[in-house]
UniProtKB/Swiss-Prot annotation:
Cell location: Cytoplasm
PANTHER family, alphabetized: 60S RIBOSOMAL PROTEIN L29
Function: Component of the ribosome, a large ribonucleoprotein complex responsible for the synthesis of proteins in the cell. The small ribosomal subunit (SSU) binds messenger RNAs (mRNAs) and translates the encoded message by selecting cognate aminoacyl-transfer RNA (tRNA) molecules. The large subunit (LSU) contains the ribosomal catalytic site termed the peptidyl transferase center (PTC), which catalyzes the formation of peptide bonds, thereby polymerizing the amino acids delivered by tRNAs into a polypeptide chain.
Residue spans of biased composition, Basic residues class: 1-26
Cross-link Glycyl lysine isopeptide (Lys-Gly) (interchain with G-Cter in ubiquitin), sequence positions: K52
GO molecular function, one term: structural constituent of ribosome
Protein name, as recorded: Large ribosomal subunit protein eL29
Source species of the chain: Saccharomyces cerevisiae (strain ATCC 204508 / S288c) (Baker's yeast)
GO BP terms: cytoplasmic translation
One Pfam entry name: Ribosomal_L29e
Subunit structure as annotated in this protein's UniProt entry: Component of the large ribosomal subunit (LSU). Mature yeast ribosomes consist of a small (40S) and a large (60S) subunit. The 40S small subunit contains 1 molecule of ribosomal RNA (18S rRNA) and 33 different proteins (encoded by 57 genes). The large 60S subunit contains 3 rRNA molecules (25S, 5.8S and 5S rRNA) and 46 different proteins (encoded by 81 genes).
Region (Disordered): 1-37
Signal peptide from the UniProt entry: none
Length: 59
């Protein structure tokens, strides 16, 4: 006779939780890889303007 059971989830959650299910690490500056090129170009200039405004406010 052919085998009948091809899959079971038994013990899988226990194995996963033994080391803890971790969230992916988040970084302060996430990569802009894959972001719309038009947005990236404008973002560069927006950051520069923000830096100038912060510097002026600091004085």
């Amino acid at each position: 006779m052919a085998k009948s059971k091809n899959h079971t989830a038994h013990n899988q959650t226990r194995k996963a939780h033994r080391n803890g299910i971790k969230k992916p690490k988040t970084y302060k500056y996430p990569s802009l890889k894959g972001v719309d090129p038009k947005f990236r170009r404008n973002h560069k200039h927006a950051l520069h303007g923000t830096a100038k405004a912060l510097a002026a406010a600091k004085k």
